[in-house]
Amino acid sequence: MRKLLAPLVLLLASTLPAHAQTPAPPVEGDAILKDFAFTTGEKLPELKIRYTTLGTPKRDKKGEITNAVMILHGTGGTGKQFFQPQFANELFGPGQPLDTAKYYIILPDNIGHGGSSKPSDGMRMTFPKYDYDDMVTAQHRMLTEKLGVKKLKLILGTSMGCMHAFIWGTKRPGFAEKLAPFACLPVEIAGQNRMWRTLTIDAIKADPLWQDGNYTTPPAAGLRTAASLSMIAGANPYALQAQYPTREAAEKYKDDAFARMFGRNDANDTIYQLDSSRTYNPWPLLEKIDVPTLWINSADDFINPPAYGITEKAAARMKTTRFILIPASPETKGHSTHTWAKFWKDDLARLLAE
């Protein structure tokens, strides 16, 4: 299945100067992966991976695609999140770092997310217990089996996608010529990071309406806790204090933001999404990353605070990696700085020019 996405065409066109041509419209499709085996030993006869593409593939004399870039979303997101103006308007236009006239951009929805196969499609809690390795395997099969991509110019990943980029670099080295992992650490999910995830899962499961995942009415109390924890985890406290300096302003923002977030996600999907990080740990294999890599975190990231000292130790082991820590300010966005390209687009342009 492939279809054009008219609203996204309008958004992309809005990034262009008046004299520029409108880019080729985004195209949405599904990769149906047969006999998909998960790391747990579970199997599905078919696994669907939804994807969106921008631009046109360019081929060499052998017919191989030479300009493919894959961008990977975070937990609970989809590939279409990268059409937000703070990302798309800084990167995809003429002369910008990921100009769609130059690159063939691939935006997958990962397993358990968006239009891809997920528990809420019907299997609920009997859906295979996927992990990040399964997600990367599905990405690889989508690229090679459906899109005919055997080599990527770049993998750019944010948050969960950042961790996927580290998996690609350590377990499938060389498939991507360059890596850009933003907003994560290349270490096992533990400490506070694992705790807020399991607190969310526990809250959903403790809601009497959840009924072991077989609910007919969404478990609102559990989902409310999930949305609350997510709001805190992704925020920048410096910006919130500067922008909402009174009790009334802070509470109004909280209520408005919560109203936008609450009810968007299925409870079982949320459980799976958060738990899929349980086996992630590229730490023992970091020396395998031997391609130019731009790794960026932000100092105001609640999920990946810089004081851990992990980044210094990791960067010393990755000889081709440049690590940048974006200083905290009232303008940065906490963990979500990863999607605000104005903070790092010049560094990305330098990576691509190497």
Which positions does each model-derived feature cover?
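Catalytic active-site module of serine/aspartate enzymes centered on a nucleophile-bearing elbow/loop
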Residues: 321-354
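Conserved acidic catalytic loop of the alpha/beta-hydrolase fold
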Residues: 133-154
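Conserved hydrolase catalytic core segment
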Residues: 150-191
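N-terminal cap/lid subdomain of alpha/beta-hydrolase-fold enzymes
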Residues: 52-120
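Short beta-strand/loop motif that positions the catalytic acidic residue
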Residues: 289, 295-297
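Alpha/beta-hydrolase-fold enzymes
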Residues: 175-260
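Active-site nucleophile elbow and catalytic-triad environment of alpha/beta-hydrolase enzymes
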Residues: 269-285
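Conserved alpha/beta-hydrolase "acid-adjacent" motif
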Residues: 302-309
